[in-house]
Amino acid sequence: MARRSGNPDEDLLKAVRIIKLLYQSSPCPNPRGSRQARKNRRRRWRARQRQIDSLSERILSDCLGRPAEPVPLQLPPIERLRLDCSESCGTSGTQQPQGTETGVGGPQISVESSAVLGSGTKN
């Protein structure tokens, strides 16, 4: 896979064909034989599947030029997150004036959360 044809779709299709061929070359083990023989065949088959998985991952990362796993999204600490509901509470379904945004606010710390929650007793 070191040579590139120049067409990324063609390269990807070629990689998928190679991976498909690898998986087809290792069918499920035969369910006949003694219990120990079946166990050994399954163990060897699982080891081959792990090798095929790692090869497939390497082929795809080479073809795509990036790792198969996405880079984890860096989020701010949960203490700094809050919903911005200062003016739009209770106005569900109405349009906001130009220039105002609602939804998830910036990383602001809500101070009035204990007053809103109260002590937990009903009136």
Curated annotation (Swiss-Prot):
Motif interval(s): Nuclear export signal and binding to XPO1: 73-84
Segment forming the signal sequence: none
Miscellaneous comment in the UniProt entry for this protein: HIV-1 lineages are divided in three main groups, M (for Major), O (for Outlier), and N (for New, or Non-M, Non-O). The vast majority of strains found worldwide belong to the group M. Group O seems to be endemic to and largely confined to Cameroon and neighboring countries in West Central Africa, where these viruses represent a small minority of HIV-1 strains. The group N is represented by a limited number of isolates from Cameroonian persons. The group M is further subdivided in 9 clades or subtypes (A to D, F to H, J and K).
Annotated TM spans: none
Subunit and interaction comment: Homomultimer; when bound to the RRE. Multimeric assembly is essential for activity and may involve XPO1. Binds to human KPNB1, XPO1, TNPO1, RANBP5 and IPO7. Interacts with the viral Integrase. Interacts with human KHDRBS1. Interacts with human NAP1; this interaction decreases Rev multimerization and stimulates its activity. Interacts with human DEAD-box helicases DDX3 and DDX24; these interactions may serve for viral RNA export to the cytoplasm and packaging, respectively.
Sequence ranges of Basic residues compositional bias: 35-49
Species of the source: Human immunodeficiency virus type 1 group M subtype A (isolate U455)
Job description of the protein: Escorts unspliced or incompletely spliced viral pre-mRNAs (late transcripts) out of the nucleus of infected cells. These pre-mRNAs carry a recognition sequence called Rev responsive element (RRE) located in the env gene, that is not present in fully spliced viral mRNAs (early transcripts). This function is essential since most viral proteins are translated from unspliced or partially spliced pre-mRNAs which cannot exit the nucleus by the pathway used by fully processed cellular mRNAs. Rev itself is translated from a fully spliced mRNA that readily exits the nucleus.
Keywords: AIDS, Host cytoplasm, Host nucleus, Host-virus interaction, Methylation, mRNA transport, Phosphoprotein, RNA-binding, Transport
Positions of region (Disordered): 25-50, 86-123
Modified residues (Phosphoserine): S5, S92
Composition bias type Polar residues, residue spans: 88-101
Protein's name according to its UniProt entry: Protein Rev
PTM info: Asymmetrically arginine dimethylated at one site by host PRMT6. Methylation impairs the RNA-binding activity and export of viral RNA from the nucleus to the cytoplasm.
Pfam families: REV
Domain notes for this protein: The RNA-binding motif binds to the RRE, a 240 bp stem-and-loop structure present in incompletely spliced viral pre-mRNAs. This region also contains the NLS which mediates nuclear localization via KPNB1 binding and, when the N-terminal sequence is present, nucleolar targeting. These overlapping functions prevent Rev bound to RRE from undesirable return to the nucleus. When Rev binds the RRE, the NLS becomes masked while the NES remains accessible. The leucine-rich NES mediates binding to human XPO1.
Keyword Ligase on entry: no
